[in-house]
């Protein structure tokens, strides 16, 4: 995954 990628955003 690229830097700063998140599978979810809270």
UniProtKB/Swiss-Prot annotation:
Q: Indicate whether Secreted appears among the record's keywords.
A: yes
Tissue specificity remark: Expressed by the skin glands.
This entry's Gene Ontology molecular function terms read: toxin activity
Where found in the cell? Secreted
Q: Name one GO biological process term.
A: vasodilation
Keyword check for Secreted: yes
Q: What is its main location?
A: secreted
Could you list this entry's UniProt keywords, alphabetically sorted.
Amphibian defense peptide, G-protein coupled receptor impairing toxin, Secreted, Toxin, Vasoactive, Vasodilator
The GO cellular component terms are: extracellular region
Q: Which family does it belong to?
A: Belongs to the bradykinin-related peptide family.
Role played = Produces in vitro relaxation of rat arterial smooth muscle and constriction of intestinal smooth muscle. May target bradykinin receptors (BDKRB).
Q: What is this protein called?
A: [Ala1,Thr6]-bradykinyl-Ser
Organism per entry = Physalaemus signifer
Upper classification of the source organism reads: Eukaryota, Metazoa, Chordata, Craniata, Vertebrata
């Amino acid at each position: 995954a690229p830097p700063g990628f998140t599978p979810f955003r809270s």
